[in-house]
């Protein structure tokens, strides 16, 4: 996991939904849990350059304990090149990677079972979707 990573998140059924990621790495490895909640969802437009307004219950958390001012740069849009999701992520919401034109790869675990619409719209460099699972492990793929 990245040592310098800030995350805007909210509680959701079963754990935490990541709404926005901040830091200096174009290839973040997202945390397995946030404040004791397992990360189970990636929210709508999470990595999109332009985002809709955030919900009132959104909270900020960082790996190193620094506040939001220490993370002025979102990992979004043309900056993001690859993302490693925690193995427990079950859902990728609509347009989570919308207009991430330099996104080359995404690594997800076998818990993934729901993928929203327009997830990879305009992700022209995307050439690898890595499903990190044992060959005989059950996956959400149908």
Where are these regions (language model features)?
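Structural signature of tandem-repeat unit edges
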Residues: 2-15, 22-40, 52-91, 101-114, ...
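Short amphipathic alpha-helical patches
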Residues: 119-121, 142
